Amino acid sequence: MISTLALFTLASVVFASPARRCTGTISSLDDVSSAVECTTININSFTVPAGETFSISAPAGATVNVLGNVTFGYKAWAGPLFELSGTGITFNGNGYTFNGQGDQYWDGLGSSGSTKPHPMMKISSSGTFTNLIVKNSPQQCFSFGNDATLMVSKVTVDNSDGNSANGLSNGKPAGHNTDGFDVSVSDLTIEDSTVINQDDCLAINKGSNIVFQRNSCTSGHGISIGSITSDVTVSNVQILDNTVKNNAQGFRIKTDASATGSTVSGIYYSGNTATGCTDYGVIIDQSYPSTLGKAGTGVTISNVTFAGTNTVSVASGADEVEVNCGSGACTGTWNWSGLKVSGGSAGSINYSGITGFTI
C-alpha cells in the first residue's frame, strides 16, 4: 500500500509549477539566474562584459521584454554574444538595440582575419521573436536552433557601417562574413525584417518548412540556399515578396562540388524584386567553392519554381541567369514562367528541364 506521505510527495512532483508567475528584471548578468525563474523577464539597458555570453534559458511560455539598449563589450573570442532558449517563448525587442560593436572587430577579412564572436545571436527558442534592432554584428548575426515552430518578425540587422573601409581593412569594406540569418533548422518563418550587410541576407544550409517573406536585403550577397554540404536535406522553402537591393546576386542556390547524399527540393519564389545585382541575378551553381567551375553530381536539385512575378535587374557587366548543374544532378521540370530579368549579359543555362523561361 502506498503511504499518505508517498502520495503527497508524488502529488507535489506532478503539480509543481515549472516557473513562478513573477517578473524578473535583468540589469546585469548577475541578475539572470533569478530572473529566469519567472514567466516575465524584463531586460534593462546595460553592457555585457567582454568575453561573456548573455544567455537566457527561459521557462516554457515565458515572455521576454527588452526595455533598453544592450551593448556587448569588445574582446577577441569565439562567442556567441547572446543566447536564448526555451519553448513557446514570446520575445519582444520593443524597437531597442543589441549592439555587438562589430566596428571594433572588422578588418575586411571576416572569418579569415582576427577572431570574432559568432554568431552574435544564437536563438534556440520556439515561439515568436520580434521587433529588435541588431547593430554591428562582429561576424554572422543570427543562427537558429529551434526544435519547434519559430516566427521571427520586424527584426533589423544593421551592419551598414561595415560597407565603409576602416584602418584595418586596406581600403576594402570593413565588414565581411556578416550573414544576416543562417538557417539549419525546420519550421521557421522570417518576415517583415531588414538586413543591411556584407554577406548573405539569408543562407539556408539545411531544413524544411521555411518561409522568408516581405523582407528587405541591401548591400550583401542576396538570398541563398547553401552552400549545401554532404548528407543534408533542404525542402519546402518559400521565398515570397522580398526586396533585394544592390547585392552581389539576387537569388542563389549553391552546392559543394564534393558533396554527396544531399537533396534540395521544393524551392518556391514568388513576388520578389531584385535590383542592382552586381554579379548575377539568379545563379544555381554546383561547383562551390568555385564559381561556375566543374559541377559536382552528389546533390540532387529538383522542383525549383519562379511563380507569380519575380523581377530581377542586374548591373552592366553582370549576368542575368547562370545555371551550372552537374550531370544528372538537376531533375524534373522547373517552371520559371514567373521570372523576368533585364540588364547586363544573358548568362547561360545547362539544364534543359526549365520551362517558361529562356535567356
Enumerate the language-model features and the residues they cover.
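C-terminal hydrophobic structural anchor segments
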Residues: 277, 287-337
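Acidic/polar low-complexity surface segments
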Residues: 69-81, 93-119, 153-180, 220-230, ...
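Sequence contexts marking disulfide-bonded cysteines in secreted/extracellular proteins
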Residues: 21-23, 37-39, 324-331
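Right-handed parallel beta-helix/beta-solenoid
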Residues: 15-34
